[in-house]
Amino acid sequence: MTDHPRVSNSGSNLSTNPPEILLPNEADSLKAQARENSYRDFMMIYFTLMTGLRNTEVIKLTIFCISPYGEISNDVEVPALIAKGSRSRSIPLHPDLKKELHSFLIWKAGEGEPLESDSPLFCSKRTKKPLSPRDFQRIVQLHSTNSINRSVHPHVLRHTFATRLLAKSNLSIVQQMLGHKSIQTTQIYLHPTRDDFTKAIENM
């Protein structure tokens, strides 16, 4: 997913209060900075950008969620136990993310991290236990500050995923991928820009 996401035109009244997102170059800079300093941090950021999971869902994922039978699955399973509202869902994994997850599991083995099915996918380097939501927040804030000169919350990664996905699909698909109970919640991503309006007129 490399298309330019829909962002608001700050000088226009066509869009009001859209979710904060990362532009493609910002997402690339964030990933590059994280990868240079911590493979685990990079994987958490990359995984969230490619799946749109919530902060609390990412940190509670286990190995089983992405590799239930010894190989990387085609989907990440978000079980009811960790999903908001106890609504389980399955999200397809992009081929590039699948390859990176395969490398990540090899890296984890080399680092002596547990790889049992119930082991955390992302864990503390020191304790090998699951990270907290605050830990993930600090990770994203650190790397975003150092790469794009502004501190962003993990939810911005989720917003970025949703906005880019909507540009390639429809609101119903985005609703299902994000795990929203109501499609009204998903409608916050319907913020067309002036360019969107211009293209719509040109395509009439």
Give the location of each predicted region.
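Catalytic-site neighborhood detector that most strongly recognizes the C-terminal catalytic loop/helix
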Residues: 78, 82, 183-203
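Short, charged hinge/linker segments at domain and secondary-structure junctions
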Residues: 1-11, 73-75, 115-119
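C-terminal catalytic core of Y-nucleophile DNA break-rejoin enzymes
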Residues: 16, 83-102, 118-139
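Basic, Lys/Arg- and aromatic-enriched nucleic-acid-binding interface segment
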Residues: 24-51, 55, 114
